[in-house]
């Protein structure tokens, strides 16, 4: 029997789900649920990363021995490490107001059509691109110290096993990834003076990145919506999905992006 542990983070709470696969059947149950309470700190609205990480460890303890574990969260948010591999600050939450006005400013460097064509990502001021532009303009000293960016699912994995990896589904929410080549968009990085070295190596969903207390730490589909779509009980072709949470996303699966 295989035992796996999934940590799912929503806007108001997180949960640890223990799954078991035996004789061709999957069963699962919630072993731990906890509040996700972002807070105002140091001039920004932030994730309470220390508290959430403590609940991750508690969830793993409640689950007992497992073969593997993984994380999913919403997209766009990230943490920054310095050159010594230390978290520089609590990650800023997408509901923070630091990106106000930056979408229009960004169009001066790369017009909307070109930006969408390069990334296929809906242009929203919460996207990681605009969060990085805010960092460049408003906190240049912090920007200079930033050595590595890890999106939130990868940041939790790093905190448990030390691995620095960037899973592609969560990277796709950043407005920095080329969906056709599944690599960073050189056009976008160049236009906004973002060094590619800031990002950890891209890995595909399902990659084993490390180990925590004897369990494999897996970079699953880190973006919660894409994680849900992957598990959707639907035909392989000609199926649409409507994923409803804090907001709703409508889409369909295709062999290649439509841009």
Model segments located where?
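N-terminal glycine/serine-rich phosphate-binding loop of ATP-dependent small-molecule kinases
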Residues: 1-89, 117, 145, 200, ...
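Short glycine/serine/threonine-rich phosphate/pyrophosphate-binding segments
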Residues: 14, 73, 129, 227-229
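Gly/Ser/Thr-rich active-site cleft segment
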Residues: 9-11, 115-225
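A short acidic, often aromatic-flanked loop/helix-cap motif at beta-alpha or helix-coil junctions
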Residues: 38-39, 100-101, 208-210
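Glycine-rich phosphate-binding loop of actin/hexokinase-like ATP-binding domains
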Residues: 78-83, 87-106, 146, 150-184, ...
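Residue-level signal for inorganic ion chemistry
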Residues: 48, 69, 96, 135, ...
């Amino acid at each position: 029997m295989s035992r796996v542990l999934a940590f799912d983070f929503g806007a108001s709470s997180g949960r640890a789900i223990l799954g078991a696969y035996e004789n061709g059947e999957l069963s699962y149950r919630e072993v731990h649920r906890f509040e996700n309470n972002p807070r105002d700190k140091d001039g920004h609205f932030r994730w309470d990363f220390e508290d959430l990480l403590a609940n991750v460890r508690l969830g793993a303890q409640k689950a007992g021995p497992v073969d593997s574990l993984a994380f999913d969260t919403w997209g766009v948010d990230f943490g920054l490490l310095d050159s010594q591999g230390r978290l520089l600050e609590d990650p800023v939450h997408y509901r923070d107001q630091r990106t106000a006005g930056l979408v229009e400013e960004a169009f001066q460097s790369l017009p909307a059509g070109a930006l969408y064509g390069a990334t296929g990502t809906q242009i929203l001021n919460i996207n990681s691109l605009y969060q990085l532009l805010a960092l460049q303009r408003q906190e240049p000293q912090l920007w200079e110290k930033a050595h590595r960016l890890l999106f939130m699912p990868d940041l939790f994995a790093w905190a448990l096993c030390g691995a620095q990896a960037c899973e592609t589904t969560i990277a796709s929410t950043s407005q920095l990834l080329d969906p056709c080549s599944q690599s960073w968009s050189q056009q976008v990085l160049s236009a906004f003076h973002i060094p590619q070295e800031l990002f950890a190596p891209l890995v595909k969903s399902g990659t084993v990145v490390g180990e925590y207390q004897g369990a494999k730490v897996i970079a699953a589909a880190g973006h919660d919506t894409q994680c849900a779509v992957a598990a959707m009980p639907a035909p392989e072709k000609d199926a649409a999905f409507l994923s409803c949470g804090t907001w709703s996303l409508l889409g369909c699966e295709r062999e290649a992006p439509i841009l």
